[in-house]
Amino acid sequence: MAFDLTDAKSRMQGAQDALQRELTSIRTGRANPHILDRIEVEYYGAMTPLNQVASISVPEARVLLITPFDKTALEEIIRAINMSDLGLNPSSDGNIVRLMIPQMTEEGRKDLAKQVKAEAEKAKVSVRNVRRDAMDSVKKEKEMPEDDVRKAENDIQKLTDNNIKAIDDIASEKEKELLTI
């Protein structure tokens, strides 16, 4: 009887996906609409994601243009951006919000690279926890022959190693992007 790895695979993939989402919100030196993904605007009394109350475009390399679908949301959009931890200063002409992405300093790049490493480490810990859970469930299988247990443990370890390598690749790609001027 072979051990089913689908749950472990999907949970490890979930850790990778969470890392990808987390890294898209880290701003580099270029304008990227995804840095605004976590910003929510109070719109008619409810907290609503910014991309549902406005269109976000990138007209230039370091400029984000936010065009509200409803002009009454303009002030709330500005307030939400100011309250976020992005460190961006929105400017408005009454119809649109313009965000200038400042050139990053060397120190800022290094700090963000450290943040990338920390997020990658969280993802690795998550993958290792999935491995531990899978190993525990293999050991709890009473009717499983010892050879099958050993094979399942090896398969789980290979899956873990592959996911850790993928996480390292994702993190190093983001670090390279950050440290490139």
From Swiss-Prot:
Subcellular location: Cytoplasm
Keyword Cytoplasm found: yes
Principal cellular location given in the protein's record: cytoplasm
Region (Disordered): 131-154
Annotated GO biological process: translational termination
Assigned keywords, A-Z: Cytoplasm, Protein biosynthesis
Alphabetical list of InterPro entries matching this protein: Ribosome_recyc_fac (IPR002661), Ribosome_recyc_fac_dom (IPR023584), RRF_sf (IPR036191)
GO-annotated molecular function: ribosomal large subunit binding
CDD domains with a match to the protein in the record: RRF (cd00520)
One family name in Pfam for this protein: RRF
A GO-annotated cellular component: cytoplasm
Superkingdom of this protein's organism: Bacteria
Function as written in the Swiss-Prot or TrEMBL entry: Responsible for the release of ribosomes from messenger RNA at the termination of protein biosynthesis. May increase the efficiency of translation by recycling ribosomes from one round of translation to another.
Similarity field: Belongs to the RRF family.
PANTHER family per record: MITOCHONDRIAL RIBOSOME RECYCLING FACTOR PSEUDO 1 (PTHR20982:SF3), RIBOSOME RECYCLING FACTOR (PTHR20982)
HAMAP family with a match to the protein in the record: RRF
Protein name: Ribosome-recycling factor
